[in-house]
Amino acid sequence: MGCVSSKLVPEPPPNAHLVETVYRQDGLKNKANRAEHFKHTSNRPREDGGGGGGTKNNQQESSGQGPRTNKKVKKYRDKFDPRVTAKYDIKALIGRGSFSRVVRVEHRMTKQPYAIKMIDRIQGKEVFEAELNVLRRVRHCYIIQLVEVFETPDKVYMVMELATGGELFDRIIAKGSFTERDAVRVLRMVLEGVQYLHGLGIAHRDLKPENLLYYHPGHDSKIMITDFGLSHMSNGPDNYMRTTCGTPEYIAPEILARKQYTVQVDLWAIGVITYILLSGTMPFDDENRTRLYRIILKAKYSYAGEHWKDISSLAKDFIDKTLVVDPNERMTATKAYNHPWLATNAATSSQKNLHRTISQNLLQRQSTRANSTKSAKSTKSNKSNRSGHSLRSDRRRVQPEEIEELHKDPEVQAELASLCSIHSHHSQYNV
């Protein structure tokens, strides 16, 4: 593998933490006392010895901050524990979710940029526990790194690397060219990270282009896997999961079928990502969620259109071996990484420029989604406490009531019956 740090490491004991720097609120109950205490420690060097740079950075910070920007920054700075602001200077809000905010910060001593995710400890309990459980245990060059953690009774502050190169598809749109070989380079990095995770018994469960970020703006930047809020780590020999979660267009059939599943769901998502990388379109796409899920359950996709004539048969074979309804027949991460399309890319992958078609399709999809989001926001009650962005985030996730509705559909019930027969022939997935 091309990553120096990609060697699998043994899973630590349950009570071990690879990230040892965890600050918990102790006897300094009074906020003023805490601020005074940490004022004298703000110039200490980092306890964990150094950092790097990733979490989503979808906004460019302006060189000159006006009064309005300063007011915004102050608003979020005031919400942070004094221990955090004593060590890190809050620069800009770069993301938000239902129970979290992500800010760009700068280490006061080293001037190194980082991202801090502030999570509501009560409302976001399930998410932050899953994310911390995984990130404290992983060390890989294609996976975003956790640097340190601050905890209070009501908030958790996760200091993480900052990826400044933007999202995968934004880079493709901005780039002047994109070939199969470029797609292969991206997928090799992603699969190297996924192999590492699966080797530790970790399923990401929300792989999608928005969670694949470039480390820096340079053309030679690596890809980083981010957002482990839905991830799951096996605690024993039973490597099955049952939670219904994910993003609709990327969710695997076995999750929709409410069957127990394994890390193989990540390979389905990689198949979807690959299809989009090579065409700029979704393999499974419908504004109606029930219809979308029906299509996914059947793995009903095609290579229609002139554009696909320029795509190699090996690339299509790679997609065909990941978008398989039966997870036992689906390629594992290791087999996908060693697939001929990826393994022989330097010699055989097409150099035909796919950029025009892909970028046009991606831009069209972005425009459609933006209009859809505006429509969704306009129909929401003004009494909602959530921001427009969090409404958008909730809408992008699979909702339990949608799956309930799906299972009432007679056509789907027939499809699920055939899936049950597949599952009955396999007692264990090949992972």
Language model regions located:
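A short, aromatic-enriched beta-strand patch in the conserved N-lobe beta-sheet
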Residues: 148-149
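Protein kinase glycine-rich loop
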Residues: 90-98, 102
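Intrinsically disordered, low-complexity regulatory segments that flank or precede the catalytic domain
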Residues: 1-85, 412, 416-431
